[in-house]
Amino acid sequence: RASKNKNEPLFILLHGAGAMGSDNLKQLFDNLPLYKQLIKTDCNILLPQAPFGSNRGEAMQNYIKSIKRLADKLPIDFDRKRIYIIGTSFGGCCVWQLIYLFPEYFAAAVPVMGSLCPDHRYEKYDFRRLVKTPIWAAHSSDDTNVRIDSDDYCAAELEKLGADIKY
């Protein structure tokens, strides 16, 4: 949805794995409560749908990079210094990856039930890359799909570095 006004922010909403597909509908329902709130404000909203099978390995990396390419090529006039990214579960994992790969691209990030390190190999990440992006992360302690310990670790590391993180 494009704003009627120029230079408004862009919100990118990323869905969970259950909304993968090619119908361009499932991701709308996955983010419906947030979408309903955002359409009351003057902003631009992008809800890309991940194709089936894009939640692992190279396919996931291709999807993640395609989100940024899509935002870069949007044919609307929006404030490129106010790009906010929000995702749940699989989408939360994508949020962590996007802000890691493109650390100064997003104005702020909200990964919900996501994981930067699903393989728990934290040593391969330089957490200093994430310090400049304000993050509000949330995770349920009884999540059975995405383990909370990755968010626990990431939040602790970022707090040590003085990052702007709420968890």
Which residue ranges define each predicted feature?
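Alpha/beta-hydrolase fold active-site loops
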Residues: 9, 43, 82, 107, ...
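Short, solvent-exposed loop/turn and secondary-structure capping segments
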Residues: 21-26, 57-58, 97-98, 121-122, ...
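Primarily recognizes the serine-hydrolase "nucleophile elbow" in alpha/beta-hydrolase
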Residues: 81-129
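The feature captures the conserved acid-bearing segment of alpha/beta-hydrolase catalytic domains
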Residues: 108-167
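Cell-envelope and extracellular/periplasmic
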Residues: 14-21, 72, 88-90, 95, ...
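Proline/glycine-enriched tight loop/beta-turn segments at coil->beta junctions
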Residues: 2-10, 130-131
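Gly/Ser-rich "nucleophile elbow"/oxyanion-hole loop immediately N-terminal to the catalytic nucleophile
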Residues: 55-89
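Active-site machinery of serine-nucleophile hydrolases
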Residues: 10, 14-65
